[in-house]
């Protein structure tokens, strides 16, 4: 039906007869001439109808936005004065000789001249996806997956599929369950990741595996989360953690070079402890020049409990954040930042405004200065490298509250004051995570997943001091987003059972849930390691959007609903009966 795409016509096509198929993006009726902007997935081209082709001109008068049409015509160069430098096709236009209206369009529920609500965009997603910016995002996503496949193939990886209907395993979120009609009362689980299957593939001898795969997690959503998402899943045998990172870093550098024309360079490596200390986060945004500075040792003897308490508590922390030029902040802005850190459990936000250092105490403005000696204030200013015009904020509490609150404040202030360089790309690896974290109930939970190997520890050493264990794990972070994470896996049965025991999984439960894995570990399991990238998040970064729904063709809302199809929906009673399922309604509160 077509010979060319609208958006691909150039001066090289001048004089050629072409047939185009697409949609009316806009129509301009000048009486004797009618111009339309005709659009397809590749872009927009101007088509015009003149009186010499009376039939086509007459039919063109009926055109409205989003009519689906076919046009045959001749490509012509535009006059110099009519060239549109803002359009890729702006140097040419098509003189139509024939027009076919393939399908007419009703009055549109989306308005191209206004910003539509996200609810409307999701309900009429098939119309929203016609917009050039949305089409470009999905084209970029397709390019990314193509580049990934070629790269992985070139590096000896095998694309192997793993099951969608599998067994529920604890991976940190709730599973989506699928009832079995054949096995009454039993359920499959949709995979949160192919984690165990890819490890089993390593045990099967397929030493380089990858898959671009759907995963499912029934969890509360955020702007960068979806109940179903896509991973670039990778696993290797006989490779160390640095070797895995080297290959995966090369993949990501390849993507940025091909999609953005940007060489990311070598990725710096930072330990979890350093990231938390300097940035209050295991996902630091290195585009932001600010860092946290520990000052607890300077404040242990002050007569100000807000500082002295955490400074003398082994579980406490006092951190300072120097904001260049921050002395210009108003009291209202400072109060807003104080309320902001309270979201993370902080009690407030102390500060020192540095107006003129040379004047000593008279050159600063601070509600806490009266509790501090001139020597201590000078020491704080020296340690933070404060200059005239700067602001110093303080966080004082337990380590987690300080890290969470001050880390979030660092990001917010950096964005608010334009200190974060939005034009840069700042990738890094974060390594050496704690293997376990407190579950809040006196036990431990795996910081990554229970199949991650500890670093330089035997099973006996791990059992004796699990709180000291460092995971042989690594995350890739770009501009403050975790885009991928992985680890060296446990390849020894005793170590795996030790980890299960630390996590409170008794031997009976181990056999019930992971018997197949424990059995497989008995038969010459190779050392193996892997990683998974979030394709949706990678695409989000590469297309410059801050909403992951913009890079998924048919996403869910934050309530995990599809507004277009109205999923989820009630099941047919007959289907439920066949599955031996009865829906129990919750009693309403009186």
Curated annotation (Swiss-Prot):
InterPro entries in UniProt: Aa-tRNA-synt_II (IPR004364), aa-tRNA-synth_II (IPR006195), aa-tRNA-synth_II/BPL/LPL (IPR045864), Asp-tRNA-ligase_1 (IPR004524), Asp-tRNA-ligase_1_N (IPR047089), Asp/Asn-tRNA-synth_IIb (IPR002312), AspRS_core (IPR047090), GAD-like_sf (IPR004115)
Coiled coil: none
Key word Aminoacyl-tRNA synthetase present: yes
GO molecular function: aspartate-tRNA ligase activity; ATP binding; nucleic acid binding
Region described as Aspartate: spans on this chain: 195-198
Gene Ontology cellular component list: cytoplasm
Keywords: Aminoacyl-tRNA synthetase, ATP-binding, Cytoplasm, Ligase, Nucleotide-binding, Protein biosynthesis
Uppermost EC category: ligase
Keyword match Flavoprotein: no
Amino acids binding L-aspartate: 171, 217, 448, 489
Subcellular location: Cytoplasm
Domain of life where this protein originates: Bacteria
Catalytic reaction equation(s): tRNA(Asp) + L-aspartate + ATP = L-aspartyl-tRNA(Asp) + AMP + diphosphate
Annotated positions binding ATP: 217-219, 226, 482, 534-537
Biological process according to GO: aspartyl-tRNA aminoacylation
Enzyme Commission number(s) from the entry: 6.1.1.12
Leader sequence residues: none
Chief localisation class: cytoplasm
HAMAP family: Asp_tRNA_synth_type1
Oligomer status and interactors: Homodimer.
Functional summary from the UniProt entry: Catalyzes the attachment of L-aspartate to tRNA(Asp) in a two-step reaction: L-aspartate is first activated by ATP to form Asp-AMP and then transferred to the acceptor end of tRNA(Asp).
Similarity comment: Belongs to the class-II aminoacyl-tRNA synthetase family. Type 1 subfamily.
Record's protein name: Aspartate--tRNA ligase
The organism of origin for this protein: Shigella flexneri serotype 5b (strain 8401)
Gene: aspS
């Amino acid at each position: 039906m077509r010979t060319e795409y609208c958006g691909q016509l150039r001066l090289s096509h001048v004089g050629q007869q072409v047939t185009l198929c697409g949609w009316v993006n806009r129509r301009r009726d000048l009486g004797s001439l009618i111009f339309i902007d005709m659009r397809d997935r590749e872009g927009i081209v101007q088509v015009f109808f003149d009186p010499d082709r009376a039939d086509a001109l007459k039919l063109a008068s009926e055109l409205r936005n989003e009519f689906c049409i076919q046009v045959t015509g001749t490509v012509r160069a535009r006059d110099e004065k009519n060239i549109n430098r803002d359009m890729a096709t702006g140097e040419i236009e098509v003189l139509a000789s024939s027009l076919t209206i393939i399908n007419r369009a009703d009055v549109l529920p989306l308005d191209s001249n206004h910003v539509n609500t996200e609810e409307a965009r999701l309900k009429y997603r098939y119309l929203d996806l016609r917009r050039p910016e949305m089409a470009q995002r999905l084209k970029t996503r397709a390019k990314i997956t193509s580049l990934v496949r070629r790269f992985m193939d070139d590096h000896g990886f095998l694309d192997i599929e793993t099951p969608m209907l599998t067994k529920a395993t604890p991976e940190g979120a709730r599973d989506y369950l699928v009832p079995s009609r054949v096995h009454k009362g039993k359920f499959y689980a949709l995979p949160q990741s192919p984690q165990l299957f890819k490890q089993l593939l390593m045990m099967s001898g397929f030493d380089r595996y990858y898959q671009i795969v759907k995963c499912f997690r029934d969890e509360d959503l955020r702007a960068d989360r979806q109940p179903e998402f896509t991973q670039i899943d990778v696993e290797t045998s006989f490779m160390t953690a640095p070797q895995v990172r080297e290959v995966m870093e090369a993949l990501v550098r390849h993507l940025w070079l091909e999609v953005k024309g940007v060489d990311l360079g070598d990725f710096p490596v930072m330990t979890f402890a350093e990231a938390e200390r300097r940035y209050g986060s295991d996902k630091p945004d290195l585009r932001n020049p600010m860092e946290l500075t520990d000052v607890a040792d300077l404040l242990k003897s002050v007569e100000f409990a807000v500082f002295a308490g955490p400074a003398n508590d082994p579980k406490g922390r006092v951190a300072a954040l120097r904001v260049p030029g921050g002395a210009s902040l108003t009291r209202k802005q400072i109060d807003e930042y104080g309320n902001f850190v309270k979201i993370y459990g902080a009690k407030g936000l102390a500060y020192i405004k540095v107006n003129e250092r040379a004047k000593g105490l008279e050159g600063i403005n601070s509600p806490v200065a009266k509790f501090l000696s001139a020597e201590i204030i000078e020491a704080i200013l020296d340690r933070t490298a404060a200059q005239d015009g700067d602001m110093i904020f303080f966080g004082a509490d337990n380590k987690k509250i300080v890290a969470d609150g001050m880390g979030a404040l660092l990001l917010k202030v950096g964005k608010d004051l334009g200190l974060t360089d939005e034009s840069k790309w700042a990738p890094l690896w974060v390594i050496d995570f704690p293997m376990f974290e407190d579950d809040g109930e006196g036990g431990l939970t795996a910081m990554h997943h229970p199949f991650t190997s500890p670093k330089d520890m035997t099973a006996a050493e791990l059992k004796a001091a699990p709180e000291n264990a460092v995971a042989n794990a690594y995350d890739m972070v770009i501009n403050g987003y975790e885009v991928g994470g992985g680890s060296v896996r446990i390849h020894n049965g005793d170590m795996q059972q030790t980890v299960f025991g630390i996590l409170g999984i008794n031997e009976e439960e181990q056999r019930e849930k992971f018997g197949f894995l424990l059995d497989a570990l008995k038969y010459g399991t190779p050392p193996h390691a892997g990683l998974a990238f979030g394709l949706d998040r990678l695409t989000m970064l590469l297309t410059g959007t801050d909403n992951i729904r913009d890079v998924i063709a048919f996403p869910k809302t934050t309530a995990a609903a599809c507004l277009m199809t109205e999923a989820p929906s009630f099941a047919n009673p007959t289907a439920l009966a066949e599955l031996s399922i009865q829906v129990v309604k919750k009693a309403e509160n009186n």
